[in-house]
Amino acid sequence: MAGAKEIKTKIASVKNTQKITSAMEMVAASKMRRAQERMAASRPYAESMRKVIGHVAQGSLEYKHPYLEVREAKRVGYIVVATDRGLCGGLNVNLFKKVIADVKSWKAQGAEFEFCPIGARSVQFFKNFGGQVSAHASGLGDAPKLADLIGTVGVMLEAYNEGKLDRLYVVFNKFVNTMTQTPVIEQLLPLPKSEDDETAHRWDYIYEPDPKALLDTLLVRYVESQVYQGVVENIASEQAARMVAMKSATDNAGELINDLQLVYNKARQAAITQELSEIVSGASAV
């Protein structure tokens, strides 16, 4: 059994770790609330944009935008949003597993693939994973701006425009609630048709002054808005996962401290018993 002094040192070390994880839990909780507010503010716009674009994809247009054309999938692109930092449980691992499973399914069909990782963990993973990394972004912080993503997303859009990509997806952790964050893969291009009941009839819009100029701008903004929404959803998911992970670490540290305290008490009791025995033995000898 370890000595009482050694155990006491271990207890002090675990207590210091517990203070750190407890502080990180509180910081993550505060950041999560702010991230939820940003996510809630941008989600209605992203969902409305997705609905309108779904209707446009269902409509009969004189001008057929390239983003509406379904091509044979020879090359697939993924914009993968992960975190910049760790200590958030299995959030990134589960996301990467989902991407790899989807990549394997496309690979079985003979398609090639390339990636646009967003977040330091995503960049690190896909540079080691294999496959072309066409663009990347990291260090966006806790309050990213759309302008920070336009250049990175633009690289993938340019590849699609030039026929170098036939499918484009965005992958991120969708925030459901504090305890649940779900990795999702959403198709960006070609534009997915709306599955709402409202599309049972054909939707047609009047485009003024020119459908080409309007759609060229609108559809690019649509892709950018969906990627931005994925980023803010992932940040909220990250802070929620980190808060839960740090709470679990704090609780585990508390249990470990209790166990070590019992061991310390036994070691101290054994030491006292040993000292008493030595005193009694010494007295008997006299």
Swiss-Prot record:
It is found in: Cell inner membrane. InterPro entries: ATP_synth_F1_ATPase_gsu (IPR035968), ATP_synth_F1_gsu (IPR000131), ATP_synth_F1_gsu_CS (IPR023632). One of its GO terms (biological process) is proton motive force-driven plasma membrane ATP synthesis. GO terms for cellular component: plasma membrane; proton-transporting ATP synthase complex. GO terms for molecular function: ATP binding; proton-transporting ATP synthase activity, rotational mechanism. It is a peripheral membrane protein. Belongs to the ATPase gamma chain family. Produces ATP from ADP in the presence of a proton gradient across the membrane. The gamma chain is believed to be important in regulating ATPase activity and the flow of protons through the CF(0) complex. F-type ATPases have 2 components, CF(1) - the catalytic core - and CF(0) - the membrane proton channel. CF(1) has five subunits: alpha(3), beta(3), gamma(1), delta(1), epsilon(1). CF(0) has three main subunits: a, b and c. This is ATP synthase gamma chain. It comes from Shewanella baltica (strain OS155 / ATCC BAA-1091).
